[in-house]
Amino acid sequence: MKNAFKDALKVGRPQIGLWLGLANSYSAELLAGSGFDWLLIDGEHAPNNVQTVLTQLQAIAPYPSQPVVRPSWNDPVQIKQLLDVGAQTLLIPMVQNADEARNAVAATRYPPAGIRGVGSALARASRWNRIPDYLHQANDAMCVLVQIETREAMSNLASILDVDGIDGVFIGPADLSADMGFAGNPQHPEVQAAIENAIVQIRAAGKAPGILMANEALAKRYLELGALFVAVGVDTTLLARGAEALAARFGAEKKLSGASGVY
């Protein structure tokens, strides 16, 4: 078993991604052929469930783009279901401390290394037990990325980085800026300083730093600092802004959005 996304992070090869919020396998397949290294299937803020995640994983599978799945919470039951339908790389939201990071890792591992329930005969991940020795290979193929999105999580970053099995740490600029008192303004100098310091700290610890930033200049800045998995756009935003711009060129009166947040 292989995990190409995890392998790329291990060797320090930057991965450029796109956020998927349309919760649709047709658009997921379209975007899988667009040249991004990874695609984030969002179960936290987009209207996804296990079934819609499954169909998007199936749609992306023939393409080089690697899927990353974000569950709605650090919940071992939900994580188990997502792994069984074929997710190998998970982005766990709102991890505040080392204990929560350890819980996330444990949920992705079969015993005795963790608490993942065994149901491989029913699982797409094992190709319904057609992958030889799946139960003994699966743990090593898992890639666990945890999100730090608050001042509390930032203060606990060093201990989170010490947790075995954490492959990367993703900085959530939208929630972090809100928690710092600058909601909707992730480009505030204090927020930017916190993000940049975290990227350097994560990389120095031998883990992969990640972030979502649609501002091209900032995304490139984070890559220069050592970020290894950077999402540079969101499908919903690309569709909305592209449609608005096209309509405007033909005289439509709708005012184009001036939003300047992360997305």
Swiss-Prot record:
The keyword Repeat does not apply. Its cofactor is a divalent metal cation. The record marks D84 as: Increases basicity of active site His. Substrate binds at Q147, A174, D175. It catalyses: 4-hydroxy-2-oxoheptanedioate = succinate semialdehyde + pyruvate. Binds 1 divalent metal cation per subunit. InterPro entries: Aldolase/citrate-lyase_domain, HKHD_aldolase_ent, HpaI, HpcH-HpaI_aldolase, Pyrv/PenolPyrv_kinase-like_dom, Pyrv_kinase-like_dom_sf. The record marks R70 as: Transition state stabilizer. A divalent metal cation binds at E149, D175. The active site is at H45 (proton acceptor). The keyword Ligase does not apply. GO terms for biological process: 4-hydroxyphenylacetate catabolic process; phenylacetate catabolic process. Catalyzes the reversible retro-aldol cleavage of 4-hydroxy-2-ketoheptane-1,7-dioate (HKHD) to pyruvate and succinic semialdehyde. This is 4-hydroxy-2-oxo-heptane-1,7-dioate aldolase. It comes from Salmonella schwarzengrund (strain CVM19633). The gene is hpcH.
